[in-house]
């Protein structure tokens, strides 16, 4: 894979990560890999090299999609006895393992949601900065299953995801408003909670989250608004924050009077200390489990 192809792969994952979130991007990528094995058209001895080239590039995307990297690592370990098998057996085993990984990932996400709905209470005013699939499903299940009445403040993020979230809330008749994130200060008295998802949680206890999360969380903390982060354990990274490869872009901006260079980052790094409650597939993560994770 040449430099341009790697840049295109980065852009592809960055776009899907921003629009779909890390959870749905992980499932989509695994299903795409299943289709790729199904359509293999090469010599048997070429397969591992081709897979390894693609997997290496995926694991090096900016930012790193931690759950997808974990899934690929498990897949590679389970495939070790099968890379030398004939093409039909190799293909069948690869598809079987990958399908099981999709099921495993989805089952952990569903368990997070089951625990998460316990943190939505009657009369809550909930801020949603970037509605990950887990956050969206927590809200839906709290309404549909627990029959809770609450309202949502949706912070405008992008032209794709924000309308999707607003439509979902509208369809479920969940009271909500959509506002620019920079106007949140005018609405803090209407909220008591903020629900968040994450691309990853690092071993030095940083959260890789959508851009703007750190500013929003700081304002919430200043105003006594409790924060809840939902992330199944596949989002917990082996690495530290500086290994997460957050994408940095530099762009020359020209005006009528001057030209300046604008530097932006694709995601925020948030101190886990800013989060009041972390929920994974086993429920609320207590300090003992966090200490075990940090090693």
Regions from the PLM with identified roles:
Residues 144-146, 155-295:
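Conserved phosphate- and dinucleotide-binding cores of soluble alpha/beta proteins
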Residues 125-136, 159:
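Gly/Ser/Thr-rich loops at beta-strand to alpha-helix junctions
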Residues 132-145, 217:
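Histidine-anchored nucleotide/phosphate-binding helix
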Residues 1-97:
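Long amphipathic alpha-helical segments
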Residues 77-122, 150, 154-194:
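Ligand-binding beta-strand-loop-alpha-helix segment within the catalytic cores
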Residues 56-84, 100-105, 109, 114, ...:
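Non-catalytic, soluble scaffold/interaction modules
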């Amino acid at each position: 894979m040449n430099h341009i192809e790697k840049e295109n792969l980065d852009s592809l994952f960055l776009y899907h990560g921003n629009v779909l979130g890390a959870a749905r991007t992980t499932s989509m990528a695994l299903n795409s890999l299943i289709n790729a094995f199904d359509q293999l058209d090469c010599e048997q001895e070429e397969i591992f090299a081709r897979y390894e080239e693609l997997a290496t590039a995926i694991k090096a995307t900016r930012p790193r999609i931690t759950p997808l990297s974990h899934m690929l690592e498990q897949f590679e370990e389970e495939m070790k006895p099968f890379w030398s098998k004939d093409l039909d057996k190799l293909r069948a085993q690869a598809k079987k393992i990958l399908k099981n990984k999709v099921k495993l990932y989805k089952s952990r996400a569903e368990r997070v949601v089951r625990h998460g709905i316990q943190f939505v209470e009657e009369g809550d005013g909930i801020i949603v900065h970037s509605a990950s699939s887990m956050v969206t499903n927590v809200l839906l299940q709290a309404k549909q299953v627990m029959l809770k009445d609450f309202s949502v403040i949706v912070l405008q993020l992008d032209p794709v995801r924000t309308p999707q979230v607003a439509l979902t809330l509208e369809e479920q008749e969940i009271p909500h408003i959509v506002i620019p994130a920079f106007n949140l200060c005018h609405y803090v008295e209407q909220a008591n909670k903020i629900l968040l998802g994450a691309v990853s949680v690092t071993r030095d206890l940083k959260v890789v989250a959508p851009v703007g999360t750190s500013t929003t969380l700081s304002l919430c903390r200043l105003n006594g608004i409790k924060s809840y982060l939902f992330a199944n354990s596949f989002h917990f990274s082996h690495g530290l924050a500086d290994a997460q490869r957050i994408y940095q872009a530099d762009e020359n901006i020209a005006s009528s009077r001057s030209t300046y260079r604008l530097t932006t980052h694709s995601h925020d790094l948030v101190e886990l200390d800013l989060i009041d409650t972390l929920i994974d597939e086993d429920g609320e993560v207590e300090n003992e489990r966090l200490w075990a994770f940090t090693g």
